Amino acid sequence: MQIHVHHSTVYEFSQPQTRLIQLLRVTPPSFSGQNVLDWSIDIDRDARMRTSTDGYGNVITMLYVDGPVDRIEIVKRGTVFTQDRFGVVTGTNEVLPPKAYLASTSLTEADDAICALAKMIERRQPGRLMLLHDLMTTIKSKMRFLTGEGDPYRMAQVAFAEGHGVCQDFAHIFCAAARHLGIPARYVSGHLYQHNGPAVQEASHAWAEAWVDDLGWTGFDIANGVCPDDAYVRVAIGLDYRAAAPLSGSRHGAGEEKMGVRVLVSQPGQ
């Protein structure tokens, strides 16, 4: 499938800023089942950009803008050819060994409730692949999905206790439970083409990957209860949202900041 992504982020400031520094994790890599045909990052003002890779192997772009700046728009766009590989991820730039993804973070720390859920599923599913599928569907059944953009920095234990959240919450809970069982798991950010849903979205999508013996890294979209197929564009990975967030950075200047995001995921010609 060919998927076109147009991801626009607009920052507006109540007072002009003297300098902006942004870290962008918005460039998808090519690997088995995903081929980036074209990709670009455009800024509506003079800026300096430097591209490299981070400690997870993600493509990152550092953006430097000198002021005065009261508004800036960052547009990421491109076309990606995808194939359905039933969630199995191969051919990626793996900088870290699987065991590195056993580390817990403040966003993926498992409390008693998440530990109990994980142990319950482990008792009824001896095989790792079936265990992970069961974990995905059980979390989905216990959580109510919220549309719109939530708080991606909410801890997994808080979201699980409240019983609702956005895709980032679902991925964090899954990672917390899997790691508690000694299964390497990681957070994934990217885009989802919705065949019967709106093309324009308010944020990027998020899911998780877990290490399965004899298969390798395998994706689980907990919010939708499926393994990623050719409707998914995989962009960045990390231990949690902080490590794979599309944008992060700092600004030099006073005043308030307002951010608007518009993501269009479509097929060419739509």
Predicted features along the sequence, with ranges:
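Short capping/connector residues at structural and topological boundaries
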Residues: T18, D70, S106-L107, G150, ...
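A broad, low-specificity signal for short, low-complexity segments enriched in glycine/proline
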Residues: M1-H4, S32-I41, L146-G148, V166-H172, ...
